[in-house]
């Protein structure tokens, strides 16, 4: 995966359309509007890598706390970096996302991994679900019962679930969407809807403004999933309901523990990439999953 995570899968389908439009003469190669993304992690790295390969200008909108080291990487890839402080008249939410949306309003191309900003990203994201389903079909072992995956903005988990459902249908394993106790807007939204007895998919989606709102002061070692809103929460919600899965919040100590296990096992994943594993570690600790159960954990995001 380009850039050390699944993010390029989401972005490549957007880039494929843009290049196709140029080849068909629908879009001028000589007057390329800049690409734009709000991220300071794997998505930004993947976006800048693809933009460099396509010789396409890109603006990356980042929070002020982005590390200088990561900024150096984006600089080497030719990205224009915009550190986004909160302004006095900003509404709630991530300032980097607000500045990104302003750039799109001015004509930039949303080169993003959030479905509500550019739904084309969801097409490429489903490939990881298809691949996992294919591998499970080849296996002659017991059927995988649960799939654990990290949740930040939600496109990764939602596309994984959709891809599994596309390929495996009613035999798709239960999708477990994992967030940390320091930032869990998706679990909060799902719990609120369940407590209100809202079961219809369309009605749940219509409650967006009531249940999905910015998380105050996100914090976790898994800093790549600190999206204060789960932008693609509807897709993830439908995936867990369709497969009999759940939204799971894990304590921060379990995030740390799971990353330690992954490193000891020889994986080079970051704490973000092992957040799904933290969900399994938690479920084993509380007895929700038997130690001989067959499960899958999707780890995406290399340590840097």
Predicted segments with their positions:
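Positively charged, low-complexity intrinsically disordered leader regions
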Residues: 1-28
